[in-house]
């Protein structure tokens, strides 16, 4: 049949239809680059990285083998100066789905002067991927989401 259709310059219409199944959860990625220049910045960057790694993971329930408390939720708001930026869509409550950190984004790890904890990197990239915890609908978009 394929050779005949090719000879005739035709293709069979498979009469396919698309059926609505569901709405996916929205995801948002935010890339960051850190280049600490001194001790204070190095400590601040380290705390920021640890903070996101900590809050993306669940907590094991005490005395409940195999059970976790859910990870932290985030409320992200796009700001312009001191106000919410209404030109960008609002983001509902999210969880941090992925936190990827690269301590050598240029292919090699370079460090500041070592201290008692080790040698802090001079350039770090971090990409955060957040996933909303609710499905968007026409009603939520009408509210600015």
Mark where each language-model region is.
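Acidic, Ser/Thr- and Gly-enriched intrinsically disordered low-complexity segments
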Residues: 1-145
